[in-house]
Every structure is written in C-alpha cells, then in structure tokens.
C-alpha cells in the first residue's frame, strides 16, 4: 500500500515537472521523474529503517520484523521497475505453502534476488548474502531485521555459523532461505561450480529444496530504462525433505546444478 502511494506521488511530481518545463522540452520531465522517484524512495527506506530500530546483529533474530520485510519488498520492486524488468515467473505452484524451504538458483545479475524479493513475497524468502551487501548503511539493518544473513566464504567457522543460523530460522518458521550456490555472479553466462556446503542448511532444518533457474537478468544492465527487458524465473522442482536428508550435500549440489543446467537449455 505504501509503495503504491509512493509511486503515485512520484508520478504526480513527474507530471508537474513536465507541465512546468513544457516551454523548454517535455523530455526534461524524464530525468526529473527519475530523480524525484529515487529521492522519495530514499526517504521511504529511511522511514522504514527508523521503524525497524533497534537492531543487534550479534544475536540471531527472535522474530522477523514485518516492516523490515515490507521495506525489502518495496526496494526489490522499485529497483526492478527502475531497471525496466518485465518478469515472467513460472512454476510457483511447486513452492510449498505449509512449510519453509531452501530456495536454490543460478546467479547472473544483481537483479536475481531483487526479483525474488519483489515478486515472490508471498513465500517470505530471505537471502544469505555476501558481507558487503549487509554492510550497506540503513539497508543492512533493514535486511538483518527481515532475516537476511551475511556469509564469509573465506572464514569456514563464520560460514558454518551462518548456515546453522539459517537452518534455525527455517526450523522456527521465521522465514525460508535463498542461496546462490555458485557463490558469485557468472560473467559469461556459463553455470559455475556449486558450493555443496550451503546445502547443509536444508538438511539441518529438514526442509525441502526449491530448485529454480533465472534467465535474462544479465541483459538489464545494458538496457536499464532504454527499453523493458524480459526476464524469466522458472521454479523447476521441489526436492522433498525426506530426499534432501537421504542425499549427501555433494549429491544435492550436483543434482541441483544438473536441473538448473537443463532449465537454462529448455
């Protein structure tokens, strides 16, 4: 609701700018719209950050903050809109509505998690992300309150702690968890090797794994607002919890990678 109001206010501001600058050139209204939209969204994020305080990152969350979750959704939708994404999502019916799950997907662009956050809001998926993302002022605190976790792959002990915390969140029905097993974005479109350790999260929590693939987000950076970009997120399969616990993490990584590889070729 608040996000809809924000968009309406920005649209009205842009319309006013077009009228005010009409004696110069109507195209001047375009950068004004973008600037006003960005500034108002910054105010939106600041307000939600104030509403989610205080935050103590040294301890796991006892309860997810719904205002922080809504703020993440707003940011995700805004950036997808700003980037000109035209999302096409299939296979949502495969995602469970009665249990938490581990969301596993390939990684092509910064827009990958934003699309999930903005458009799969119903399933309450929080991501394990690199520490630099969680260190962003204001945004990092909001993300932490929404259940997002940093993982330092260079520090095995810290990485294990994150995996155990993520499993605990799912056990306590706080949120589902999303990971990108490649560990980083692919630069040439080819699927990178999967880190098997992250699959321990699902085994510890005894939850199913939703395997998905994303296509087209790597094109967004080249286009931005010039023209919309069709992007595709396909939910390929839900691996039942019983099967997850019966397989090794290496087998889960190999199987998930194979399914994603097949999905990208389809």
Name these PLM-found stretches.
Residues 160-266:
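Non-catalytic C-terminal accessory region of glycerolipid acyltransferases
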